[in-house]
Amino acid sequence: PEMVQTTAKRPIILALAKYFDRHQLGTTRLAEESLADLSPGQVRFRVERFAVTSNTVTYAVTGDVLGYWDFFPAAEPGWGRVPAMGWAEVVASNHPDVATGARYYGWFPMSRYVDMTVKPTADGLRDEGPHRAAHAPVYRAYVRTDRDPYYQPGEDAEDRHALLRGLFITGFLAEDFFADNDYFGAARVLVLSASSKTALGFAHCADARTGIEVIGVTSTANHAFTHAIGCYDEVICYEDIATVPSQAPIVSIDMSGNGAILARVHTHFGAQLRHSMAIGRSHHD
């Protein structure tokens, strides 16, 4: 939502932005902000939709350590805007090579509008703001829908992409790492927080490989759902980790961030645990 106030000079658009207390994530506030004139090289996105999931919480929890708070800095100390995957349209441009009306997929804040200093790329735009310089290119990339080979039109398809696409890529890259290392000599992989989207992406890729047994570990509440997905050879609950045979080599990938559960895995398998990868923190309370 937005409001327009008229002055003698020009209209001032007030847009809503959502801010989180960086040290008390349950504390949030909505702020009305006026939009300044665009500087040369800048564009203004109107955010249309974004996905809010447990993974979004991870961005906030690890915001200081991994720099997620720096994606879209807040002017007021102690507050921040959480990034989320979604879709937005360019509604104003002060860049000679970027037209209004184009729609893009990428990282956006939980705000109605966001201004970026951009550079055109082969498939879209890249955020060139100095506060983003230290971030990996994948986090700064915005893909234009008419240049996106994976784009599917329609609200349902766009919702699914916002929910799943980014984390499937994370799972794919993690599985590719294990494959490049021949699964460290193991023929089994234990996937913690198996119902999470990154885990499902990983398991989908691992399940396609010959000779790799994929064991999902999840909560009792999520067991039936995780089993029904069909990409795990076996699904067990956290309390049943000790029932998995520990005599043969195994590797693990943890999306939960639960130190107590991961410690049980290391204790149970001992030297047979050939590699332990940690990604994310889905068990944050």
Predicted regions: what they are:
Residues 264-285:
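Glycine-rich phosphate-binding loop and adjacent beta-alpha segment
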Residues 189-193:
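Conserved N-terminal Rossmann-fold NAD(P)-binding element of oxidoreductases
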Residues 207-262:
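Adenosine-nucleotide cofactor-binding segment
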Residues 107-187:
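NAD(P)H dinucleotide-binding glycine-rich loop of Rossmann-like/cofactor-binding domains
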Residues 58-81, 127-142:
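Aromatic- and Gly/Pro-rich amphipathic surface segment
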Residues 199-200:
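N-terminal Rossmann-fold NAD(P) dinucleotide-binding loop
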Residues 36-50, 64-115:
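Glycine-rich beta-strand-centered segment in the early N-terminal region that forms part
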